[in-house]
């Protein structure tokens, strides 16, 4: 049977309680790192029992996955902001600002990001990056690519897949080459996407 504390806690809306646990886990991961945070630490921070934690999450891995979803949502929110700030027809500005966005995403330094970068958590890091690539590629195909195609020809097939691979490649390259030149990164994006950096096309001529 559950304790009185458990019953009181369960009276809170389920989604809110779950969000509280995820927020506590994220805060602790950022403060201490993944390996130094236990389920007990998380429940102590929220003020609930372990049995209530396990009502929402089967294990620490499950709540960590939810924390990753939070980070992905942050990155998507930043991408939405980037897209909203783009200047119509100004490809150079879009390239410069998206490179800055990618750098911020890769090099935000908190304990959890450092934990993800460790060999111990390599599989978790790959999962995180793949989630980011999927969500951002989907969003860009549905928004930015549509805007671009109104002014230029889209010269790539498999558009979603190309963006997915490009995002993975840029993130991986920046992690191993943090001093990479921004102009080189912009060139890589343009070459991969076969973008037209010149004037908008007005007909079907090459």
Which residue ranges define each predicted feature?
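N-terminal intrinsically disordered/low-complexity leader segments
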Residues: 1-16, 201-206
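Short hydrophobic clusters on alpha-helical segments that form packing/core surfaces
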Residues: 17, 21-29, 71, 167
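Helix-turn-helix
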Residues: 20, 28-62, 66
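Alpha-helical DNA-contacting segments of helix-turn-helix folds
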Residues: 64-71, 128
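Hydrophobic alpha-helical connector segments
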Residues: 66, 77-107, 159-163, 186, ...
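Amphipathic alpha-helical packing segments from all-alpha helical-bundle domains
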Residues: 76-77, 122-149, 153, 157-161, ...
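Amphipathic alpha-helical segments used for helix-helix packing
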Residues: 94-97, 101-127, 172-176
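Hydrophobic alpha-helical segments that form the core
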Residues: 101-103, 153-176, 180-194
